[in-house]
Amino acid sequence: MQLEHCLSPSIMLSKKFLNVSSSYPHSGGSELVLHDHPIISTTDNLERSSPLKKITRGMTNQSDTDNFPDSKDSPGDVQRSKLSPVLDGVSELRHSFDGSAADRYLLSQSSQPQSAATAPSAMFPYPSQHGPAHPAFSIGSPSRYMAHHPVITNGAYNSLLSNSSPQGYPTAGYPYPQQYGHSYQGAPFYQFSSTQPGLVPGKAQVYLCNRPLWLKFHRHQTEMIITKQGRRMFPFLSFNISGLDPTAHYNIFVDVILADPNHWRFQGGKWVPCGKADTNVQGNRVYMHPDSPNTGAHWMRQEISFGKLKLTNNKGASNNNGQMVVLQSLHKYQPRLHVVEVNEDGTEDTSQPGRVQTFTFPETQFIAVTAYQNTDITQLKIDHNPFAKGFRDNYDTIYTGCDMDRLTPSPNDSPRSQIVPGARYAMAGSFLQDQFVSNYAKARFHPGAGAGPGPGTDRSVPHTNGLLSPQQAEDPGAPSPQRWFVTPANNRLDFAASAYDTATDFAGNAATLLSYAAAGVKALPLQAAGCTGRPLGYYADPSGWGARSPPQYCGAKSGSVLPCWPNSAAAAARMAGANPYLGEEAEGLAAERSPLAPAAEDAKPKDLSDSSWIETPSSIKSIDSSDSGIYEQAKRRRISPADTPVSESSSPLKSEVLAQRDCEKNCAKDIGGYYGFYSHS
């Protein structure tokens, strides 16, 4: 008999619905069909002896005392079991099907009964977000705010989204379908049941693509910058959707509503409420996706990204009104995704059932700010946002941490469909560990005090996305592999202190460089790619040229990491002219490189632009024209004020120990040439 219940629960439900209160004809049944639905509606006026409870116990074959072991039988739990027998039964289903994940989705139920009009429709899977219910927000009235539940009731689409709707649509929640258990690893997946009476195919299932990244920010309370001109969100909203009618047309848009009625402030290292929110703000709160309207096949074919959505605090913003969402600082907001089926002519008809679907992901909540308050959020933005160049210019002067490890990307955490450089730099072992020493601040050398963002001090170049410039980004839908030129095992970037002593070391490094072309690396023609993808110069030399790591962003660059070469002969000439020591030892340099390239022996002693010390294929940028920057980098590395002088026996290139004053003067000249070819990017 129990097997019959499991195989055909809809048949049993149709027989038992007569015993359920008539005002909730489909609510309990819809939750029962979704066996793994963790968000259960609290229906206080269900009959205490509802046969649904008996059905669920028969399906799970559990006794009345076989509840969650972690519930501790608190008074709230007892009250919950008395108030909602449907919840009690389905929670056992969660325990049977999902095992250890069940305790994450215990419903926080108030110990006092609430009416059906004010009871929260569902819950957030985060204990800190449980709270009293508030009047729900309507899209037509921005003055209302959102209650603590994923689907908004009493709104413009109440007849379609409420649990007590005559159509009987189930509440959109966080079910974890069995077929997605391994590929998505428990990501939020909204689903409408197709077995519900009256439903037809075309009900959406939505997946938040970059949920791991959102959760990282959510742990520290996400903050979003708002400006007068408008600022894009990071992380941005990105969804995958399925279950639509491929031939029907849909509008997909996002609106941003108040998540609670409080005004917030950052005090004592945490966000605390301070007063009531201002609910009289007028302005656009809706952002329509640029592809709307479009067919269901189009929406399901690709990721739906809202990366161009901008947040502003300009209440009178009339231009670009379609891209601007007007918010208030120090208020907490909740984005929502709406999928609306439209007619052939593109007009919306919300009066028909099933045409509007709304999805809310609580981990996308954020507090609007004009400046970041939490340094943890700032560091997360630096680590994951490849376009946060303003932070990298000023972060080490604004905040206390100056050592280099505050600017490193986080390895092995590249989320899906989010352009982050984290996995690009996931190197093995000591190559990462020895890069950024604690005395980096002592070795810093800035071109000027208080350098701000600008073309002359663009420090965001090394933080681009591996080999790819932003214009060369591949399909963001898959996790990004490592994108280094060479593998950690064959890495020749960590030169020894005497790397320039013998031709053998240079020949080995030249062979490594030549192997790039054989691998078909597209970003190696540096003249075409510019300097937007500088993976070779990102990490400092771990062991060579002294005990300290060289400054990463100043002119005294290490020749061992081969920074981005100048893309024109004019830039090379400027760099050569800025260093008077380059011409003095040009003859010696050409003579020492002769075993590598016989053509360099008859080169002009004073003209390094003609010294071809390596044979390069046609696919690589010619070193004859502008490769004097390599020797220039070696010389500038030697005269860096932060370096320890190398003994005469270990470096044949060394001629003398320069005075500190001369070092500063020459480095200042070198910086101008070094940043000259970055100004165009």
Swiss-Prot record:
Compartment annotation: Nucleus
Record's compositionally biased regions (Polar residues): 58-68, 462-472
PROSITE patterns in the record: TBOX_1 (PS01283), TBOX_2 (PS01264), TBOX_3 (PS50252)
Tissues where this protein is expressed: Expressed in the developing and adult cortex. Expressed in the olfactory bulbs.
Tagged with keyword Transferase: no
Gene Ontology cellular component list: nucleus
Keywords assigned: DNA-binding, Nucleus, Phosphoprotein, Transcription, Transcription regulation
Low complexity bias (residue ranges): 108-122, 618-628
Region (Disordered): 43-83, 108-127, 447-483, 597-655
Pfam families: T-box, T-box_assoc
Residues with the Phosphoserine modification: S410, S594, S640
SMART domains linked to this entry: TBOX
GO biological process annotation, one example: regulation of gene expression
Residues annotated to bind DNA: 213-393
Phenotypic consequence of gene deletion: Homozygous mutant mice do not nurse and die between postnatal days 1 and 3. Brains are smaller than those of heterozygous or wild-type littermates, olfactory bulbs are small and olfactory bulb projection neurons are absent. Mutant mice show severe defects of cortical development.
SUPFAM superfamilies attached to this UniProt entry: p53-like transcription factors (SSF49417)
UniProt xrefs under CDD domains: T-box_TBR1
Recorded GO MF terms: chromatin DNA binding; DNA binding; DNA-binding transcription activator activity, RNA polymerase II-specific; DNA-binding transcription factor activity; protein kinase binding; RNA polymerase II cis-regulatory region sequence-specific DNA binding
Keyword Transcription regulation applies: yes
Modified residues (Phosphothreonine): T408
InterPro entries assigned to the protein according to its UniProt record, in alphabetical order: p53-like_TF_DNA-bd_sf, T-box_assoc, T-box_DNA-bd, T-box_sf, TF_T-box, TF_T-box_CS
Described function: Transcriptional repressor involved in multiple aspects of cortical development, including neuronal migration, laminar and areal identity, and axonal projection. As transcriptional repressor of FEZF2, it blocks the formation of the corticospinal (CS) tract from layer 6 projection neurons, thereby restricting the origin of CS axons specifically to layer 5 neurons.
Assembly: Homodimer. Part of a complex containing CASK, TBR1 and TSPYL2; may modulate gene expression in response to neuronal synaptic activity. Forms homodimers. Interacts with FOXP2. Interacts with FOXP1. Interacts with BCL11A.
Protein name as annotated: T-box brain protein 1
Lineage summary: Eukaryota, Metazoa, Chordata, Craniata, Vertebrata
